[in-house]
Amino acid sequence: MADSVDRVFVHALNTVKKIPKTGASRPPPTDRLRLYGLYKQAMEGDVDGVMERPTAASGLASDELQREKDKWDAWNLQKGLSRTESKRRYIEALIDTMHRYATTPDAEELVSELEFVWNQIKDNSPSSSLSSPRPNQSTGAGAQQPQQEPEQASDGEGPLKELRPMSEYDEAELRSQRQVDLEDDEVDVPTSDRSSGRWQRKVERALTTMSAEVAALREQIMTGREWRTKKERSVPAWVKWFAWLLVKHIFADLVILSVVLLWLRKRKDQRLEDIVRAGVRLMREYVRNVLPSRG
């Protein structure tokens, strides 16, 4: 189910881009920092090894330095979460935040569509305890890590846990991590070979990202069709359709009646015109009797 979570995560990021800049209430800094931390954890993993906590030695202004520290702390609060679990929490936090602060009709429709997509898969997606194990970054034989991790889990925690198969996205990450470990171990490899391996890893990551975006776009198109079908089958949609159909028929009847009256008047035949005048006279009398008099 990690692929489904990835698709909804991309859908959530697109939803954030589509939120109107005017009219909607801005969430408080605590909510924005929590979303930022979950986003960075989902995209890059733990903050350790990626960047250090900003200090005064970085040369930033006091206000900007405090903002960078808050961002780093928000990211560090999500330490230890897998990428799939971070994406799940980001989606749920975004839906909750938009329900509280998205007050415009466009924003409400965006969060309703995102929640509709998320409800379809969240009950079937595994929790973080059942997600695929993250590759260990310690030095050593990287190719033997997938076989060693189930044994460590069984020795350290007693009962065996159910491990689901890794998704294509996780397998691509594992292959990239293996290449990084092999590059670190093989010191005697020529520079040209290491450059080609680094280039190959970048290409694989780009292909993986492109595949996820294409799958997310396909999911978004299918979801949009389902959403439109659901709205078209609602009671207000049926009422609007019936009212529009009635107006079209009345307009068409009036046009046909006008053409027939003109044709008969040209032939000096006033029978139909007399019938129409009598009908209009009866309608006026009925309206005069129903509506209260002005006096």
From Swiss-Prot:
ACB domain ranges (all copies): 5-103
GO biological process: autophagy; fatty acid metabolic process; protein transport
One GO CC term, this protein: peroxisomal membrane
Consequence of gene loss (knockout): Does not significantly decrease the growth rate under nutrient-rich conditions.
Known glycosylation sites: 136
Composition skew (Low complexity), residue ranges: 125-153
Residue numbers spanned by region Disordered: 124-162, 174-201
Keyword Transmembrane: yes
Membrane topology: Single-pass membrane protein
SUPFAM superfamilies on file: Acyl-CoA binding protein
Membrane-spanning segments: 244-264
GO molecular function: fatty-acyl-CoA binding
Subcellular location: Peroxisome membrane
The entry's keywords: Autophagy, Glycoprotein, Lipid-binding, Membrane, Peroxisome, Protein transport, Transmembrane, Transmembrane helix, Transport
Keyword Transmembrane helix: yes
Role noted for this protein: Acyl-CoA binding protein which acts as the peroxisome receptor for pexophagy. Required for both micropexophagy and macropexophagy, but not for the cytoplasm to vacuole transport (Cvt) or autophagy pathways. Required for functional micropexophagic apparatus (MIPA) and relocation of ATG11 to the peroxisome-sequestering arms of the vacuole. Binds palmitoyl-CoA but not oleyl-CoA.
PANTHER family from the UniProt entry: ACYL-COA-BINDING PROTEIN, ACBP (PTHR23310), COA BINDING PROTEIN, PUTATIVE (AFU_ORTHOLOGUE AFUA_1G12300)-RELATED (PTHR23310:SF133)
Homology family: Belongs to the ATG37 family.
Official protein name in the record: Autophagy-related protein 37
Origin organism lineage: Eukaryota, Fungi, Dikarya, Ascomycota, Pezizomycotina
